[in-house]
């Protein structure tokens, strides 16, 4: 496996209904550089674990699964996957999220490579609430600006960067 320029950080716990779409959106990325997908599987009790290991078997040059022996919780899972990432850059896509743009990694990496004075890029996203079926479009509603409270971009209001 080539050293990746970008590591896609994905944590998951009981995301069986969503995990395939999350992984497929990463695998569909069109890039001119190598990237990896590092999945932190935290002892899911549904079929998530089997799904991520199946993908890892089918895409061994791209996907690495770091599986818990016992549930460690979201924070510890998040941190250990950061440490497992080997890329110069880290992109986040949680196991119940997905990207719409198949060139997301290429665009963001091109920007960072051509602007070494920047250390973070993010993109707007829609939030979908499964229980109500409601979507909040353009959650950040900013262009080329850091929101007033940039730490909330990282936290994603409880979700992580998208």
Model-derived segments and spans:
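Nucleotide-sugar donor-binding/catalytic module of glycosyltransferases
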Residues: 1-162
């Amino acid at each position: 496996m080539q050293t990746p320029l970008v590591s896609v950080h994905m944590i998951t716990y009981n995301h069986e209904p969503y995990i395939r779409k999350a992984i497929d959106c990463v695998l569909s990325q069109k890039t001119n550089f190598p990237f990896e997908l590092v999945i932190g599987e935290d002892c899911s009790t549904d079929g998530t674990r089997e799904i991520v290991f199946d993908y890892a078997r089918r895409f061994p040059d791209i996907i690495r699964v770091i599986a818990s022996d016992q549930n460690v919780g979201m924070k510890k899972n998040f941190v250990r996957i950061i440490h497992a990432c080997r890329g110069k850059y880290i992109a986040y896509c949680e196991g119940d999220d997905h990207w719409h743009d198949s060139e997301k990694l290429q665009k963001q990496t091109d920007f960072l490579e051509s602007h070494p004075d920047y250390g973070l890029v993010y993109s707007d996203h829609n939030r979908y609430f499964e229980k109500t079926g409601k979507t909040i479009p353009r959650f950040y509603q900013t262009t080329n600006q850091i929101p007033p409270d940039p730490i909330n971009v990282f936290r994603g209001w409880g979700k992580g960067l998208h």
